[in-house]
């Protein structure tokens, strides 16, 4: 999960609250210009007592890795996350160490252009299943934040409502959700449309299509259904794909946002008949 927004809107607070609610082992790493790859993956050091090299695990050896302000470090350090996010493992000095199950990365970043930030590599962005934006709170929410936040810790009352075993069980249940061929074709058509749009220079990859399918299955499971309907795909199309596409020169000069281009694609691609109606 990648959360992007301006500083001060609660990205890190939400990430910490989410990890506490899951009740899983969590490690947090604050990305800075001097953060190195070994801070993430770990390192080996000679142990004089054991007369051998010992592996010291990094921040990635956990269930939930909170990567705060991920776009404030170097590209070399970012590359250490590629294997971690894709293969759920880290390789140190030629030896591969599997990460605990379940595993997820929750990252926060400020918009590119903010002082001290740099754009994440495309290969890394593509590994995030979904990108969310907090946005500014409305007047009522702002009043609640000021009245409650000034007197107590907003995270103090967050309790664990899940366990690793329960989460793995829910993941298996979501994977078993049925997807009709028409919905598979719909996802494929949507992603293909991003590759043939004059306002987009880089479209959604096959990995992105898989992510859209998986999150649609999870959403259907959450809704209490054993099958995916086209609306499940539409609900998350922009969230799954906005960080995976790159606008062309024409799109940028026109002042378009990735979300608006994706919204036009949603309107232009024919949606299959609702599966619920056919049942």
Language-model regions: role of each:
Residues 46-67:
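Conserved alpha-helical scaffold flanking the Walker A/P-loop in AAA+ ATPase domains
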Residues 157-212:
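Conserved AAA+ ATPase small/helical "lid" subdomain
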Residues 196-279:
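C-terminal engagement/docking regions of AAA+ P-loop ATPases
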């Amino acid at each position: 999960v990648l959360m992007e927004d301006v500083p001060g809107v609660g990205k890190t607070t939400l990430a910490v609250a989410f990890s506490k609610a899951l009740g899983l082992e969590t490690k947090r790493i604050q990305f800075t210009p001097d953060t190195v790859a070994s801070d993430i993956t770990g390192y080996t050091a000679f142990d004089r007592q054991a007369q051998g090299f010992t592996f010291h695990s990094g921040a990635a050896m956990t269930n939930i890795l909170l990567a705060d302000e991920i776009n404030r470090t170097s590209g070399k350090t970012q590359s250490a996350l590629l294997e971690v996010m894709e293969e759920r493992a880290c390789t140190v000095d030629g030896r591969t160490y599997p990460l605990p199950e379940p595993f997820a990365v929750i990252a926060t970043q400020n918009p590119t252009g903010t002082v001290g930030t740099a754009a994440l590599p495309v290969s890394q962005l593509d590994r995030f299943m979904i990108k969310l934006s907090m946005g500014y709170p409305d007047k009522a929410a702002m009043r609640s934040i000021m009245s409650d936040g000034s007197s107590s810790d907003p995270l103090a009352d967050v309790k664990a409502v899940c366990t690793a075993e329960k989460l793995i069980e829910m993941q298996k249940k979501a994977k078993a959700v049925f997807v009709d061929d028409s919905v598979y074709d719909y996802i494929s058509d949507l992603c293909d449309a991003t590759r043939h749009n004059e306002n987009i220079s880089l479209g959604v990859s096959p990995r992105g299509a898989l992510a859209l399918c998986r999150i649609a299955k999870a959403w259907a499971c959450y809704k209490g259904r054993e099958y995916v309907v086209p609306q499940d795909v539409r609900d998350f199309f922009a969230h799954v794909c906005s960080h995976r596409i790159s606008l062309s020169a024409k799109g940028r000069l026109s002042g378009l946002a990735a979300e608006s281009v994706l919204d036009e694609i949603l309107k232009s691609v024919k949606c299959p008949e609702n599966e619920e109606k056919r049942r």
